Amino acid sequence: SRFVDIIAERFDAGVRLGPEVGSGMIAVRISPDMEMAVVGTPEHFRRYGFPQTPADLVAHPCIAYQFGDGSLYAWELNVDGKKITHPPQGQWAFADSYMEAKAARLGLGLAYVPEELITDDLAQGTLIRVLQRYSQRLEGSFLYYPHRNVSPALRAVIDTLRM
């Protein structure tokens, strides 16, 4: 994902994962960190088997997250304390994690989504989580804005969303 120059593009503020922002910007946390989960349907695992390691994901159709610039999010996983990436291979890409989870429910492949989106599915058995010990915890969302000239309206938004 790219950093949006909110000043040049005339935005009052932006939202992104993690607190890394450009110089002259302030970042305010607005959501908790996210535990990511690799999930699929029972039928998917009957057909393809259960992956035991991240390397096994190449044998599975995977649902991708697509950024606004068209690039795909490479799944970030932990192996022996090191971050590795898995570029998802499959026919489906969505610019929305909710749609990724829905596609997984429909049996279109494995999805790598925030656990909070699929908690009910896991409890009901409609989705099964795999590779849990390899999953990453991603930093939550931050609202970022220029240090100068905070309008009363933006201040109200910041104060409401701040965690």
Listing of model-derived features with the role each one plays in the protein:
Residues 73-87, 121:
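Ligand-binding cleft/hinge of the Venus flytrap
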